[in-house]
């Protein structure tokens, strides 16, 4: 069976944006104009097709990436919806991994928001080419050129407008296309799908010429050939301009900018034309890196030939079909009814039904080809980030990095009967979301759930109730503290026990040294002359790692330490792995007590946008929460305060901020780094932990 859309004509794109920049509306309009959905869904009434989980409808924010297939001018566009809320950056990371290009949506009034910076950084990390759509041009305060400046100054990118707006706010009529030098005007609001090409209005001619010159300059820098032509005073042809824009976009040296208002249906068709013209096909982006089990690196090219290789990037539980695993195929093809090999887990998987999703309608298909995205029903062992491959070529594609959770709460089912239902629900949710963890507190026996922020955990508890009908009582949020050491020490420890018959003997000298924040744990074997036999060294490492689980101050995990074993002794008969493990573990604990152990806490980067009248109150409150104000800025008449605050002091912040500013301030918060806890606070924590 051959593919219906050639690889060259496939586009895998994501729509990335800050909350309320109009991302879901833009996705909806794309589906509308590509003819897939007949009635446009509005986020305001909670009816958008892309937002298909209950909580999103209520909160009006997009949480899970649904992958949707649509068609525009004989191209297949696979649209991956990315969430804009900061607690869901893991979802964004995950979708960035499988995108080839992105449309970054900015609000013409709000411009570059803190979350836009996070998403932009992630797109840079994965080298995703993008085009910018400045949305909401009909709103009061709309300013296309401000957004252009912010992209240049705050995101350090090189924005190149391919359009400039005709009017703004209530007078927004359309755009001037700088490539063709025509005005595209939407004359009749009742027929949003129709626009007319006209001559450029006289009052905008000069501005259009100025911006076209800037565009041509940027385009000419994408190749020596175009540069020569441009410097020689020759006109660039339409074809050359388009080729230059695409080359600049793919090399990330320019970011093409367009504008419109998705809500009023203006500017969406030209945006789709730009997606097709300037964003890459799967075979135009860098090959994806992979490796074999023995560590040999290999590069996997997007092509129909060759053995199958794909990445599972999302797991969802669908009420009708059960578990869906979303897969991006990089090479070869995946057929329903066949087998694939999970090379990450070393297990064979049977491929049941294959579905292409249209936000929440499904189409059953027989084959997924290279470059395509679809969902597989019924995989048993495959989790997010696993590679599926052919048994003949067991490649493992790049692994994804998932952050460690920073906040935990204890949950208990309201009735004992729900205990098992709750465990099943939490395990399913943990399979879908690698940044969410479930564990059991060994002392209290309580179930602990951990995630990336308060909202993240609220939504998990909410989903338990809605999807699994489990009502849960939620405890007080707990912060994920850590411990570390501040000075280097050397520690000897001898573990010797004689209890009739064979004894136990392990003897080590350890050097403990603090490392830079974020370095984790490093183990060095510096044993000379076999004073501790080689086979016992892994046991020493293991003993230290076990001791790291419970720090000496308050039992929190220890990080950022380097431990060197440099001397010791052993006994021919009595030494064992167990003895060395215990010697290392106890030796580390004794050493840590002398090494200036301190407690670390997660610091959040908090950005508050507030009207000036409330600025004093907001800053005063952040100081009370042990926050350090880092910078102050202005945006759209409001003050922007950036601060680093301990997570422990930020619980319930949204309610407090609302009451301080009569609901007029907004904030965003994301984990930034770990920092030492002040002595008085540390004493409190230790007292509480050690009872």
Swiss-Prot record:
Q: Where is the tr-type G domain?
A: 8-283
The Gene Ontology terms for molecular function here are: GTP binding; GTPase activity; translation elongation factor activity
* Chief place where the protein resides: cytoplasm
Q: For this chain's UniProt record, which GO biological process terms are given? A: ribosome disassembly
Tell me the compartments it is located in.
Cytoplasm
Question: InterPro entries from the xrefs?
Answer: EF-G-like_DII, EFG_II, EFG_III, EFG_III/V, EFG_IV, EFG_V, EFG_V-like, G_TR_CS
**Top-rank taxon:** Bacteria
What keywords is this UniProt entry annotated with? Cytoplasm, Elongation factor, GTP-binding, Nucleotide-binding, Protein biosynthesis
Reply yes or no: does the keyword Nucleotide-binding apply: yes
A GO cellular component annotated for this chain's UniProt record is: cytoplasm
Keyword Transmembrane on entry: no
List, alphabetically, the CDD domains matched: EF-G (cd01886), EFG_III (cd16262), EFG_mtEFG1_IV (cd01434), EFG_mtEFG_C (cd03713), EFG_mtEFG_II (cd04088)
The record lists GTP as bound by 17-24, 81-85, 135-138
What HAMAP family does this protein map onto? EF_G_EF_2_B
Protein task:
Catalyzes the GTP-dependent ribosomal translocation step during translation elongation. During this step, the ribosome changes from the pre-translocational (PRE) to the post-translocational (POST) state as the newly formed A-site-bound peptidyl-tRNA and P-site-bound deacylated tRNA move to the P and E sites, respectively. Catalyzes the coordinated movement of the two tRNA molecules, the mRNA and conformational changes in the ribosome.
The family classification in the record reads: Belongs to the TRAFAC class translation factor GTPase superfamily. Classic translation factor GTPase family. EF-G/EF-2 subfamily.
Annotated PANTHER family: RIBOSOME-RELEASING FACTOR 2, MITOCHONDRIAL (PTHR43261:SF1), TRANSLATION ELONGATION FACTOR G-RELATED (PTHR43261)
Give the protein's recorded name: Elongation factor G
The organism of origin for this protein:
Campylobacter jejuni subsp. doylei (strain ATCC BAA-1458 / RM4099 / 269.97)
Q: Which gene encodes it?
A: fusA
């Amino acid at each position: 069976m051959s593919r219906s859309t050639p690889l060259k004509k496939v586009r895998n794109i994501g729509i990335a944006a800050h909350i309320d920049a109009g991302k879901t509306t833009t996705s909806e309009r794309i589906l509308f104009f590509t003819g897939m959905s007949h009635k446009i869904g509005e986020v305001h009434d909670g009816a958008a097709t892309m937002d298909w989980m209950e909580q999103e409808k209520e909160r009006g924010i997009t949480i899970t990436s649904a992958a949707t297939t649509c068609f525009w001018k004989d191209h297949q566009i696979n649209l991956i919806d990315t969430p804009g809320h900061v607690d869901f950056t893991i979802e964004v990371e995950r979708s960035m991994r499988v995108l080839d290009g992105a449309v970054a949506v900015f609000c013409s009034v709000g411009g570059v928001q803190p979350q836009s910076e996070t998403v932009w950084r992630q797109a840079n990390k994965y080298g995703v080419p993008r085009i910018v759509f400045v949305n909401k041009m009909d709103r009061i305060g709309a300013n296309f050129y401000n957004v252009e400046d912010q992209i240049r100054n705050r995101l350090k990118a090189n924005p190149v407008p391919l359009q400039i707006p005709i009017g703004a706010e209530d007078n927004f009529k359309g755009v001037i296309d700088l490539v063709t030098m025509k005005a595209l005007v939407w004359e009749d609001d009742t027929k949003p799908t129709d626009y007319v090409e006209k001559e450029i209005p006289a009052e905008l001619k000069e501005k259009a010429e100025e911006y076209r010159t800037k565009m041509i300059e940027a385009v000419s820098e994408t190749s020596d050939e175009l540069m020569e032509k441009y410097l020689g005073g020759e006109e660039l042809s339409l074809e050359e301009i388009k080729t230059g824009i695409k080359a600049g976009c793919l090399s990330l040296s320019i970011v093409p900018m367009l504008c419109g208002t998705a809500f009023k249906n203006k500017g969406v068709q030209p945006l789709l034309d730009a997606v097709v013209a300037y964003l890459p096909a799967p075979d135009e982006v860098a090959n994806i890196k992979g490796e074999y089990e023995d560590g040999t690196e290999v590069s996997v090219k997007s092509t129909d030939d060759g053995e199958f290789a794909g990445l599972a990037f999302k797991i969802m539980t669908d009420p009708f079909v059960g578990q869906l695993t979303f897969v991006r195929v990089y090479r070869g093809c995946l057929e329903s009814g066949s087998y694939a090999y999970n090379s990450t887990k070393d297990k064979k998987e049977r491929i049941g039904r294959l579905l292409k999703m249209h936000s929440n309608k499904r189409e059953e298909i027989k084959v997924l080809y290279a470059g395509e995205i679809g969902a597989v029903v019924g995989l048993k062992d495959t989790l997010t980030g696993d590679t599926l491959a052919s048994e003949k070529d067991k490649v493992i594609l790049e692994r994804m990095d998932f952050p460690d959770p920073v906040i935990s709460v204890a949950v208990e089912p309201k009735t004992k009967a729900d205990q098992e239902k709750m465990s099943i629900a939490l395990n399913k949710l943990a399979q879908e979301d690698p940044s969410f963890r479930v564990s059991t507190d060994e002392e209290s026996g309580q179930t602990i759930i951990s995630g990336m922020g308060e909202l993240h955990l609220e939504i998990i508890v909410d989903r338990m109730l809605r999807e699994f009908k489990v009502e849960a009582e939620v405890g007080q949020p707990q912060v994920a503290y850590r411990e570390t050491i501040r000075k280097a020490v050397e520690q000897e420890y001898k573990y010797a026990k004689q209890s009739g018959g064979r004894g136990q003997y392990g003897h080590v000298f350890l050097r403990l040294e603090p490392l830079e924040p974020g370095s984790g744990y490093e183990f060095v074997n510096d044993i000379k002359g076999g004073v501790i036999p080689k086979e016992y060294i892994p046991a020493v490492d293991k003993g230290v790692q076990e001791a790291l689980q419970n720090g000496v101050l308050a039992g929190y995990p220890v990080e950022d330490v380097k431990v060197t074993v440099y001397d010791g002794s052993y006994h021919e008969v009595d030494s064992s792995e167990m003895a060395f493990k215990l010697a290392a573990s106890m030796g580390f604990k004794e050493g840590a007590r002398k090494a200036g152990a301190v407690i670390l806490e997660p610091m959040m980067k908090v950005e508050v946008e507030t009207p000036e009248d409330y600025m004093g109150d907001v800053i005063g409150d952040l100081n009370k929460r042990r926050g350090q104000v880092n910078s102050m800025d202005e945006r759209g008449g409001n003050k922007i305060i950036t601060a680093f605050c301990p997570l422990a002091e930020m619980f319930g912040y949204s309610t407090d901020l609302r009451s301080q500013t009569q609901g007029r301030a907004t904030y965003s918060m994301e984990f930034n780094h770990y920092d030492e806890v002040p002595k008085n606070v540390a004493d409190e924590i230790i007292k509480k932990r050690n009872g």
